[in-house]
């Protein structure tokens, strides 16, 4: 018999809210493993590296020195 036949459940990672879309305070924007995206203005990091908004506004992605940042503006 084979030793294959197993598969893990998907972890539903990725970007949940894209650029210029509205987000509410506490809203999850990105689920990730490690800090692929770093927190910018009005964004905090959860213990599993989830990025979430700390205030209402619109999502903005930017790259600074080859690092990707996510901010909430206006």
Swiss-Prot record:
Q: Name one Pfam family in it.
A: Ribosomal_L27
Q: Which family does it belong to?
A: Belongs to the bacterial ribosomal protein bL27 family.
In Gene Ontology terms, what is a biological process of this protein? translation
A molecular function (GO) held by this record is:
structural constituent of ribosome
In the UniProt record, which is one GO cellular component term?
Answer: chloroplast
InterPro entries, alphabetized: Ribosomal_bL27 (IPR001684), Ribosomal_bL27_CS (IPR018261)
Compartments it resides in = Plastid, Chloroplast
Q: Does the keyword Ribosomal protein apply?
A: yes
| Keywords assigned by UniProt, alphabetized | Chloroplast, Plastid, Ribonucleoprotein, Ribosomal protein
The identity of this protein, by name, is Large ribosomal subunit protein bL27c
Does Chloroplast count among this protein's keywords? yes
Query: Which coarse location class describes where this protein primarily resides?
Result: plastid
């Amino acid at each position: 018999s084979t030793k294959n036949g197993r598969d893990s459940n998907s972890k539903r990672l990725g970007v949940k809210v894209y650029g210029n879309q509205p987000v509410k305070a506490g809203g999850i924007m990105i689920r990730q493993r490690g800090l692929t995206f770093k927190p910018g203005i009005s964004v905090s990091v959860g213990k599993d590296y989830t990025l979430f908004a700390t205030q209402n506004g619109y999502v903005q992605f930017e790259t600074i020195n080859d690092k990707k940042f996510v901010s909430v503006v206006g």
